[in-house]
């Protein structure tokens, strides 16, 4: 082991034996002495979490039509422009996607409309 390695091991062992208060004091001294900030390392470590993109496209899924199938069929027709037969088939085939790849506001609005008609709806 070289002299530099020995010094590093000794320093590490000394730090390991310190109390938390002493370690915090050491950090403060090192920040002042070397003009660095321990917070910068935390900010760099947090950066990858910000890289996660917010979802922009949503699917509205009809899980069940509930007690009022007719009202749900009407709501599906109004929202999708489907004919009566197609809307009825979609509702009866639940769970089924009503609309796919729409923005959050439209998805929330459609969910509210379908729930008011009595449907059980999910957004993914």
From Swiss-Prot:
GO CC entries: cytosolic large ribosomal subunit
Which InterPro entries does this one have? Ribosomal_bL12, Ribosomal_bL12_C, Ribosomal_bL12_C/ClpS-like, Ribosomal_bL12_oligo, Ribosomal_bL12_oligo_N_sf
Alphabetical GO biological process terms:
translation
Keywords for this entry? Ribonucleoprotein, Ribosomal protein
A single Pfam family, by name? Ribosomal_L12_N
What are this entry's molecular-function GO terms? Answer: mRNA binding; structural constituent of ribosome
- Region forming the signal peptide: none
**Family of this protein:** Belongs to the bacterial ribosomal protein bL12 family.
Complexes and interactors? Homodimer. Part of the ribosomal stalk of the 50S ribosomal subunit. Forms a multimeric L10(L12)X complex, where L10 forms an elongated spine to which 2 to 4 L12 dimers bind in a sequential fashion. Binds GTP-bound translation factors.
The protein's role, per its UniProt record? Forms part of the ribosomal stalk which helps the ribosome interact with GTP-bound translation factors. Is thus essential for accurate translation.
- Descriptive protein name: Large ribosomal subunit protein bL12
């Amino acid at each position: 082991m070289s002299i530099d390695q020995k010094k590093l091991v000794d320093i590490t062992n000394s730090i390991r034996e310190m109390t938390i208060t002493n370690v915090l004091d050491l950090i403060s001294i090192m920040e002042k002495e070397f003009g660095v900030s321990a917070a910068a390392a935390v900010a760099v470590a947090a950066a990858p979490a910000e890289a996660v993109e917010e979802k922009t496209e949503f699917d509205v899924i009809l899980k069940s039509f509930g007690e009022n199938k007719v009202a749900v069929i009407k709501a599906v027709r109004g929202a999708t422009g489907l004919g009566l037969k197609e809307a009825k088939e979609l509702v009866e085939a639940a769970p089924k996607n009503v609309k796919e790849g729409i923005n959050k506001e439209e998805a929330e609005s459609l969910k509210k409309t379908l729930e008011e008609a009595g449907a059980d709806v999910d957004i993914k």
